[in-house]
A protein has these predicted regions:
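Polybasic, low-complexity intrinsically disordered segments
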Residues: 1-7
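HDAC/HDAC-like amidohydrolase catalytic core signature
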Residues: 7-312
Length: 312
């Protein structure tokens, strides 16, 4: 990145982080394909590093209705979703999953508000980009980023938003929900051969071939971020999924630890250079070793916080 960087000036000692104890839905077993324990582990690691957290409220139904069909929302909250729809999501819809899903949406909405106030913030969950208008998929129940974007637009807190989605999977649900919203720019950088098979168009899609490594990935990222910022957003939502990592079992790309750190740092620097607030969410990350995934997620916080500490 070229040019003088602007410092992210927090109105508090550290980068604002949002966490809710119900992010870890304990009804999901440890051997499930989705490493639910990572959320508690991320919080433990960051707490040990001296961070404190903002705790969000559970998103009210009215917020969820901004992005999702009320009948679908009611089926989740009432645990009446049919078995086929639940299988598409990948979870049994228990009270804990319903509560977790509302907490994650509330967390992204709170992180977005904190980002507008302080320059940047991170929700230590979120990034449920496969949830579409009338149903969930791929471990995603409610689309927290879409809800957050539409809520802030409705309230007039922002005039335009951009979504920079760097999870390894295409942001299909976000594209469907925000596709008709002219004030939202959606951009997805993903593995083209990966799930989902059908990829409804975002405003900008960059699909990378299997095995793409750091150099080619970061070159594509520059294009993605430049186009997103050219849309002149008042806020960027950044899905910082760590599933492009070479060791991720669902990823198919080959980023290193250094590559992920460079990605996160580049996004933060680009937003800071144009004084655009950044709301980051964790997104995906899949491994039988939940601690390894949690450590990768913690790298997001370190990368964003380092911009504020070291910027000229």
């Amino acid at each position: 990145m070229t040019g003088r960087r602007r410092e992210i000036r927090y109105l508090m000692p550290m980068l604002p982080l949002v966490h809710h104890p119900d992010y870890d839905a304990r009804t999901v077993p440890d051997d499930h394909r989705f490493p639910m324990r990572k959320y508690a582990l991320v919080a433990d690691m960051l707490r040990a590093a001296g961070y404190e957290f903002f705790e969000p409220l559970l998103a009210p139904e009215a917020w969820l209705h901004l992005a999702h069909d009320p009948a679908y929302v009611g089926a989740i909250l009432g645990q009446t979703l049919d078995a086929k729809a639940a299988r598409k999501i990948g979870f049994e819809i228990t009270p804990a999953i319903a509560r977790r899903s509302r907490a994650a949406v509330g967390g992204t909405c709170l992180a977005a508000r904190l980002a507008l106030e302080h320059g940047a913030a991170v929700n230590l969950a979120g990034g449920s980009h496969h949830a579409g208008p009338d149903g969930g998929a791929g471990f995603c129940v409610f689309n927290d980023v879409a809800v957050g974007a539409l809520l802030l637009l409705q309230e007039g807190a922002v005039r335009r938003v951009a979504v920079v989605d760097c999870d390894v999977h295409h942001g299909d649900g976000t594209a469907l929900i925000l596709g008709a919203e002219p004030r939202a720019f959606t951009a997805s950088l993903h593995c083209e051969q990966n799930w989902p098979r059908e990829k409804p168009p975002s405003d900008l899609d960059i699909g990378l071939p299997k095995g793409t490594g750091d150099a080619a990935y970061l070159a594509a990222l520059e294009t993605l971020v430049a186009e997103a910022l050219a849309s002149q957003p008042d806020l960027v939502f950044y899905n910082a999924g760590v599933d492009p990592h070479a060791d991720d079992r669902l990823g198919l790309l080959s980023l290193s630890d250094a590559g992920l750190a460079a990605r996160d740092r580049y996004v933060a620097e680009a937003c800071a250079s144009q004084a655009v607030p950044l709301c980051a969410v964790l997104g995906g990350g899949y491994s039988s070793d939940a601690s390894a995934v949690a450590r990768r997620h913690c790298g997001l916080v370190a990368s964003i916080d380092a911009i504020g500490m070291s910027a000229e």
